[in-house]
Amino acid sequence: LDNTAVFSPPISTLFANLRRQIDELDTSTTKVVVFGGGTGLSNIIGGDSRRRDWARNPFTGLKQVFPQLASVVCVTDDGGSTGELQKDLPLIALGDLRHVLVASVRRDHLRRSYDLDRIGARRCAAVLHALFNYRFISRPESAEQMVRESGAIVADLPAELRRVVDDLTQRLFSDPRLIPTLERPQCLGNLLVAAAIYKQIDPALGASELLASHQVVRTATIRGLAELAGALGVQPNTVLPCTTTLSQLQMLYSNGVMVTSEDKSSKARRGYPVDRVVVDFSRTPFL
């Protein structure tokens, strides 16, 4: 086959025409909801916020086209930092939510909320990018050290947003329920999301009580995400989990073997095709 046919000019022309048609539309009242996982959603909504060069052009993607854009994010990815976090906290997988949350930061929201100019908004997004993507292996000695080693220039944050970041990072070292998470390799962004959720929960409730109090965790998750989103320059309640019920992905292979865990299935080399994919919920799911 002629490889040049794969990326033929007509295809790029079609995309260019589509973009031109969308640009000509009034999308101010168009409500758009996008479903998916962290990487895919992040890319189309505002660019892959895990990329090192994302901060150079953070205000791009569908969020610039549709003001009333919302994302519903899958929460079964239990690999990496998220998997480590779930060893200590009875929360849904937060990694993809964090990924999409950063990608959803809007210039107009930052400017309106904090009276920033265009350069100030871009610098603010760059700080959030550094903070939410920073990963550590050994336990940080303090919140200040953790923020400093992230490389984030926190002086570029508006005072009000800086107070939000300070509050959440300090909670990681003061809330007895969150302190154990610092002993494992973590992504700071996931910890900040967890701290925002636990901020909504009665300090007297530990892991065992929260496992039995799914309504409490559900409410705290939605409220915590909304409050954090608003502070980050994201419209509240526009980055939502597909469920707040603890769940795991299960892959059934054609040879009858079932693998539980999205992370494990991604590393499995069974030599057989996947016959079925199901989600195993810890209880009747709230969707």
Each predicted region: which residue ranges?
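Non-transmembrane, aqueous-exposed alpha-helical and coiled segments at domain scale
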Residues: 1-34, 39, 48-67, 71, ...
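Short N-terminal binding/cap micro-motifs at the start of the first secondary-structure element
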Residues: 40-45, 79-82
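Short, flexible/disordered intra-domain loops and linkers
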Residues: 46-53, 206, 210
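Electropositive, gly/pro-rich neighborhoods at or near active sites that engage anionic ligands
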Residues: 61-65, 74-286
